[in-house]
């Protein structure tokens, strides 16, 4: 409440569980659930939003029906911005059942919907490449391609995520150079 009284914003960034990402609104009986917040209904999202108030709320998309989840996140959370993985959380990394092409189609459909809401889009793509050992050029190019795709679909606002010290074997100056190059291109 102190932040709100000072006219400042804070964000609840909800790291949802694997089952929330892959099996939202399905029966979870007997399924193991990795770490994160286990949310399985719009009502649970609404309770989180209400309890987080006056903070803004945001979360990542899921591994299937990405456009449907974007709509649910709008309705139930009034999500501050939408974070999408584009290339990831599919057959490519084993965290979802979509092929890469199906995943991109779902994400692009979701972006087209998000554009109608006027909310920003965050392509949390580059750091996923870095987590998987990609070089800095791949990191930068993936961020550029995601930004270009979002812009071409009509988004007016994008949140560019730039994680430092990823992967572990880099050091600060390299990360800053990588980040500055990506910002310059985007």
Label the predicted regions.
Residues 1-147, 151-153, 157, 161:
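Catalytic alpha/beta active-site cores
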Residues 25-26, 170-172:
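Short acidic, glycine/proline-rich loop/turn micro-motifs
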Residues 138, 171-178:
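Short glycine/threonine-rich loop-to-helix capping motif typified by GTGT followed
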Residues 166:
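Acidic/histidine-rich catalytic neighborhood
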Residues 186:
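Conserved, mostly hydrophobic/aromatic
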């Amino acid at each position: 409440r102190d932040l709100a009284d000072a006219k400042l914003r804070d964000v609840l960034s909800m790291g949802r569980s694997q089952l929330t990402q892959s099996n939202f609104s399905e029966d979870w009986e007997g399924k193991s659930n990795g770490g994160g917040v286990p949310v399985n209904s719009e009502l649970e999202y609404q309770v989180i939003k209400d309890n987080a108030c006056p903070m803004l709320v945001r979360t990542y998309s899921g591994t299937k029906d990405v456009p449907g989840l974007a709509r649910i996140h709008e309705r139930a959370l009034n999500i501050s911005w939408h974070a999408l993985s584009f290339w990831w959380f599919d057959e490519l990394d084993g965290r979802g059942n979509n092929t890469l092409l199906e995943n991109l189609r779902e994400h692009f459909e979701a972006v087209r919907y998000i554009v109608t809401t006027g909310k920003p889009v965050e392509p949390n793509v580059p750091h996923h490449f870095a987590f998987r050992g990609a070089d800095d050029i791949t990191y930068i190019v993936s961020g550029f391609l995601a930004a270009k795709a979002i812009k071409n679909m009509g988004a007016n606002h994008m949140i560019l995520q730039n994680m430092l010290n990823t992967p572990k074997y880099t050091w600060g100056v390299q990360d800053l150079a990588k980040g500055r190059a990506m910002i310059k291109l985007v």
